[in-house]
Amino acid sequence: EKELVQRIDRIDYKYLRDYLFQLSLQQSVDSIHDVINSLLIKGEPQYRIYDELILNVLNRIGDLWLNNKLSIADEHTMTETIRNVMYRIHSEISKNNVKIPKKVICMTLTNDEHEIPLVMIQSILDEINIPSTNLGPNVPVPSIESKIQAVNPTHLIISSNYVLDTDTFNSAISRLIKFCHKKDIEVLIGGSGNHLLIEENRSATIELKN
């Protein structure tokens, strides 16, 4: 415990990644939550904790599973543990009544079931008082368009971490770009799918970074 406190004080992400990896294997939701809360109390911004710690651990879990070094049961257990922590943190974020005059819709496209990045995005937006609607993972384009009509957002955030077919992916992005630009809605794309964008789509969207 003393070493953990010292590592958190030094914000030693290399150590903390290994530590959280083991905690997720043990399904220690409370312990992971405590580590992240300690970093937040120290003033670490949420986006850095997510990028340096959570996403890193999730990528490691995914890579080990792809290389048959982690069972599907362990992969599911570890991912679900981290997902539960993210939802708990999101529910605890204090929401200020003063909202910034922006409105965001976020989702993943068809076949992309990665839910955790969406929870992270929504938590960060809540922290800076930007209203957001999380449509969840695996949302078809017509459903996104219907929600845009209903909510009238200023920004559309597409989280893309799994692309089954590049042509279908770019076709969906192109359609959403045209739909959004008619309404002056900015389209942001985050995740590994960014590097699969055709140039026309890349130039018409904003890459979501920290």
Describe the role of every protein-language-model region:
Residues N68-S71, T77, N84-N210:
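C-terminal regulatory/effector modules of DNA-binding transcriptional regulators
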